[in-house]
């Protein structure tokens, strides 16, 4: 998912997406440990999506604090 698409979402939607991606990452790690993961690169992509969301949430938090 691109950062541009994520920036269009509200904070609540981003937090929901973050929770969803963390669950997905946990499942991917479990599948990888068991040995049944077809695309291990999916773990890396999911971690990057999580990082993008956290970055956008932090940027918004800082812009709100700076505006006060």
Swiss-Prot record:
Keyword tRNA processing: no
Family matches, as InterPro entries: Ribosomal_protein_uL29 (IPR050063), Ribosomal_uL29 (IPR001854), Ribosomal_uL29_CS (IPR018254), Ribosomal_uL29_sf (IPR036049)
Record's GO cellular component terms: cytosolic large ribosomal subunit
GO MF annotation: an example: structural constituent of ribosome
A Pfam family the protein falls into: Ribosomal_L29
Keywords: Ribonucleoprotein, Ribosomal protein
PROSITE patterns the record matches: RIBOSOMAL_L29
PANTHER family linked to this entry: 60S RIBOSOMAL PROTEIN L35/50S RIBOSOMAL PROTEIN L29, LARGE RIBOSOMAL SUBUNIT PROTEIN UL29C
Family per similarity comment: Belongs to the universal ribosomal protein uL29 family.
Protein name as it appears in the record: Large ribosomal subunit protein uL29
């Amino acid at each position: 998912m691109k950062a541009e698409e994520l920036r269009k979402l509200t904070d609540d939607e981003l937090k929901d997406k973050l929770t969803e991606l963390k669950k997905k990452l946990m499942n991917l790690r479990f599948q990888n440990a068991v040995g049944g993961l077809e695309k291990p690169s999916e773990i890396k992509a999911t971690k990057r999506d999580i990082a993008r969301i956290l970055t956008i949430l932090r940027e918004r938090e800082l812009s709100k604090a700076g505006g006060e």
